[in-house]
C-alpha cells in the first residue's frame, strides 16, 4: 500500500491562482498532481491585485522572472496617501525601491491566472488541469484520500490520491466537510466597488494613490504600462465604504 500511495498524485481542488501555483511547486519537486476546476472554461476574469515581494520571490523560484511578469502587470514604485485637499499625508517606496530583493507587482488577476494555467499545461501536460469538475467531498482511507467529483452534466466520479489540497475558495466544500461546526462567513461591513478604466498614470507612473476619509476612500493604481500610441494605461480603482 505504501508503494502504491507513493505513486498516487496529489489532488488539488480549485484552479485559481493558489491551486495553480501549488501544482507548479509540486511539479518542481517531483510530486505528481492533478488540478480539478469547477468551471468549464477558465477566462481572464477579475481586476487588479498586488503581489508583495515575498510572493514574487516564490514566482521567481518557479521560473517567472521580471520579463515574464511584466507581461501581466507592472512593478509598483510608490504608495501615497493624499488628503482631500490634494496634499500628501504620507508616501513610501515599494518593492526593490524599498530595499527588498524582489519587486512588488500590480497585475491583472485574470491575466496572471491565464499565465499560470498556460505554464501548468506546458510543464505538467494538457490533462493536468481538468475543467468542469467540482470537488464536492472526500473520503479518507488507509492509502490516502478519495475525492468525490461532480461533472458539469451532474454525473460523478471518484479519484484516488495521496493527499487532497483545498484551494476551492471562500465557499470550500472540503473545508465545510472537514469543519462541519464552522460558523457561517461573517460580513465585516465594508462595501467595495472595483473596476478598471483607461487613464493616464500619475505621480511616478506606478504609484498607489489613496484619497478620502476614515470611512470613505478611493484607491487608484495602474496595472499595465501606458499604450505608446495613446499614453493610457489600465487603471485599477477601488471605491470603499467602511
Per-segment meaning from a language model:
Residues 2-10, 54-178, 183-196:
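Conserved N-terminal helical subregion
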Residues 10-12, 33:
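Conserved hydrophobic helix-helix packing surfaces used for dimerization/oligomerization
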Residues 82, 207-242:
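Active-site substrate-recognition segment that forms the wall
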Amino acid at each position: 500500500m505504501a508503494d502504491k500511495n507513493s505513486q498516487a498524485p496529489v489532488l488539488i481542488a480549485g484552479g485559481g491562482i493558489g491551486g495553480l501555483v501549488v501544482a507548479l511547486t509540486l511539479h518542481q519537486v517531483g510530486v505528481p498532481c492533478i488540478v480539478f476546476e469547477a468551471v468549464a472554461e477558465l477566462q481572464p476574469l477579475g481586476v487588479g491585485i498586488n503581489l508583495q515581494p515575498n510572493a514574487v520571490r516564490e514566482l521567481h523560484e518557479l521560473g517567472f522572472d521580471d520579463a515574464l511578469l511584466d507581461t501581466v502587470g507592472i512593478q509598483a514604485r510608490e504608495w501615497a496617501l493624499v488628503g482631500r485637499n490634494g496634499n500628501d499625508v504620507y508616501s513610501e517606496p515599494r518593492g526593490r525601491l524599498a530595499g527588498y530583493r524582489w519587486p512588488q507587482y500590480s497585475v491583472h488577476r485574470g491575466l496572471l491566472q491565464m499565465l499560470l494555467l498556460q505554464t501548468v499545461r506546458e510543464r505538467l501536460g494538457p490533462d493536468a488541469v481538468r475543467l468542469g469538475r467540482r470537488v464536492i467531498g472526500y473520503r479518507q482511507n488507509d492509502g490516502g484520500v478519495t475525492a468525490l467529483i461532480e461533472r458539469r452534466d451532474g454525473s460523478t466520479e471518484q479519484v484516488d490520491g495521496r493527499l487532497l489540497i483545498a484551494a476551492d475558495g471562500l465557499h470550500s466544500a472540503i473545508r465545510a466537510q472537514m469543519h462541519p461546526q464552522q460558523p457561517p462567513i461573517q460580513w465585516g461591513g465594508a462595501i467595495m466597488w472595483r473596476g478598471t478604466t483607461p487613464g493616464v498614470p500619475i505621480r511616478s507612473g506606478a504609484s498607489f494613490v489613496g484619497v478620502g476619509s476614515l470611512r470613505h476612500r478611493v484607491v487608484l493604481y495602474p496595472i499595465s504600462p501606458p499604450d505608446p500610441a495613446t499614453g493610457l494605461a489600465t487603471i485599477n480603482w477601488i471605491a470603499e465604504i467602511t
